[in-house]
Amino acid sequence: MSTRREMRAEAQAFIDNLKPLQHPNSQKFYLNGSRPDLKVAMRQIYQSDTLIGGTAEAPVYEKNPPITVYDCAGPYSDPEADIDVRRGLVKLRSEWIAERSDTQELEQVSSGFTQQRLADEGLDHLRFEQLPKPRRALEGRVVTQMHYARRGIITPEMEYVALRENMARETVTEEVLNQRAPGESFGAKLGEPITPEFVRQELAAGRAILPLNINHPEAEPMIIGRNFLVKVNANIGNSAVTSSIEEEVEKLVWATRWGADTVMDLSTGRYIHETREWIIRNSPVPIGTVPIYQALEKVNGIAEDLTWEIFRDTLIEQAEQGVDYFTIHAGVLLRYVPMTAKRLTGIVSRGGSIMAKWCLSHHKENFLYEHFDEICQLCAAYDVSLSLGDGMRPGSIADANDEAQFAELETLGELVKKAWQYDVQTIIEGPGHIPMQLIKENMDKQLELCDEAPFYTLGPQTTDIAPGYDHFTSGIGAAMIAWYGCAMLCYVTPKEHLGLPNKEDVKQGLIAYKIAAHAGDVAKGHPGAQIRDNALSKARFEFRWEDQYNLGLDPDTARAYHDESLPQESAKVAHFCSMCGPKFCSMKITQEVREYAAAQATDVREIEVEQIDVTASAPKADIQQGMAQMSAQFKQSGSELYHSAIRQSPGVESTSLESTSLESTVLESTSLESTALEKAKEV
């Protein structure tokens, strides 16, 4: 295990030598919008051609089109990008923000805490060198994407996300790639295709948010809403006992490479302010925070000493740095705290427990609730979106869907309507630990109480028995709630409940949650979601191994697993794998049946067993002997169509196959007759 110093040195080396992190056989490309500076980043996965006939000397191939996929990595996946984390990313949206003429550049920062940090020369070695001047709305102006949408304005950001969400699916014309079963959307109204006007309508109605602080122009526009692709958030951040600025920047880059749509900086240790500046200046995705964490650091961790003034200054500090969305635990009310007394695991939300302790200590109402109007006014001046935190979320499935959880949800519904009065974009955070049978009730209640504001859930975790594997236990619930209508999933890593995640944990959590999000998109019937599935399935059936790896979410791992058993280069074109071997590969057998049908000029679906001539290449006596042997084995096994794999008939050797059903009994024969019968059975 690496020491802390070694880990920091490795992270430093990573960012010093940072080059674009490309997936194999992929290429970054840009779709052009309606203006020269509107170029929407995507990734194309190139495929090899399919051999469909001809001869060894003159083979005939069928071309397979490149598959376009969503790309969160910004410049980090562009081989032509000049990356320097000390300089930060290109300010993609600066011109769009400036030309609206509703913001002003400030001569100095507004936060008293930020002014103190800038005056401290002892922090110079940690500071991001090229600090931009912050912007704020002009007096009396509102600069949120919701505000523009409600006034009928389609911004460049809205056009950007419309192009991005469609993923160029109009270019996919192959019927085999476009096929899909009807989805069940549970009332979601999916745009087909997604247009800038559709995006505007969803933002205006509050059913979606476009989280983009005017002080984070480096971020590429993305949208969160149940009528769009399900998004995934990754959490990073240092703590009082581990991690450094270098490691957090490394984790940010790594997270976007593996598909994080947004990143939350949950730092609680030293240098929170400086760490966040480095993260924002180098982030192509929206950044979220929980401001109460930093406010607590400012009062030395004593919750009772928190004040509205300290918290307000923290909001201004973070808004002027460029934080795109705040998690605010304004729904933890004094009267709800006693409801948690009977819980198995009490209050498990850090923000929720901080505010509960403050309420009890002062016996006053939550100051975040009391000052919510001022919070909204502040957010409207920077276009910071609100993520209303679920401080009463259950920390075990025993506490799921209890009185405290749903009481807070009702209050969040009240607060989202108030935020909309200020044109502040808002999402609702959700649980937590919920068994499968209670998940849909959470989604249904949220839609009802919060007027379809986007739902953002941590999992939910469906069982509590698997520390070290909570990316699995929660991934199950995440897939379900994504299908029911959740707009964004907060990933869970293998280290959940155990420790701070490292790079590999971040990757594992993201892969698990990208699977869950995609499964939800397919189940909802999102147009175009299944194209990648179909392309990979076609590659699998045609034994295009490299295409199978490259079309997957994690090509490196897929290739490594295949290489463990079949490392030879020849295995990359073989028509079998180590799972079944060359004799029992179902897809190979199916292909042989299709080839037979083609030779007979017959529709493969119309083949009858009697049509297959199995006597042409095997002696008749051998065939009859094999058939007699299999007949005897079937009778000795009790003449049962299906029976247990561990059952062994007298006088008959046990087989290595997992099942001795009629199908596997036929397969056990090495005669050509049994192979032909199995081919017909597969059809």
Swiss-Prot record:
Q: Mind telling me which residue stretches traverse the membrane in this protein?
A: none
List, in alphabetical order, the Gene Ontology terms for molecular function in this entry.
4 iron, 4 sulfur cluster binding; carbon-carbon lyase activity; zinc ion binding
Per the UniProt entry, what is one GO biological process?
thiamine biosynthetic process
Q: Where does substrate bind?
A: N235, M264, Y293, H329, S349, R350, G351, D390, G391, M392, R393, E429, Y456
Q: Cofactor note, please?
A: Binds 1 [4Fe-4S] cluster per subunit. The cluster is coordinated with 3 cysteines and an exchangeable S-adenosyl-L-methionine.
Cross-referenced HAMAP family: ThiC
NCBIfam families, per the entry: PRK09284.1, PRK13352.1, thiC
What protein does this entry describe? Phosphomethylpyrimidine synthase
Quick one: which gene encodes this? thiC
